[in-house]
Amino acid sequence: MNPETFIEKYAAALATQDWQQVDPLVHPDACVTFSSGAVHVGQTAVRQAFERNFSLIQDERYAIENVHWVMQGEDTAVYLFTFHWSGIINGKPTSGAGTGSSVLINSENGWQLLVEHLGPKTG
């Protein structure tokens, strides 16, 4: 797997709303910041945050677009992106979008998410 393939697998795994699909793609030391400003450090905290979102948002659709590679090396890759999501929350259609930045690390388990920072949509 290369960093580009990682993004495809990550988006597909998130779309399943099943942590078991996402887990192999998240580094044990991962740190994820949601657009709300909530910071989740470590794979356990990240898992709990994602599972909370999975249970809150039904039939979620998630897309990563406009990927811009800041750098790609043999062991590290950094990219910027936009994201869009939609789903049902409390019986009502809901959606959102924003920007993000991610750091990937090529570990003994292949490419994994080390840092993800999601922010509000700009411009």
Give the ranges of each region predicted by the language model.
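A beta-strand edge to alpha-helix "cap/lid" segment located at domain peripheries
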Residues: 1-21, 31-123
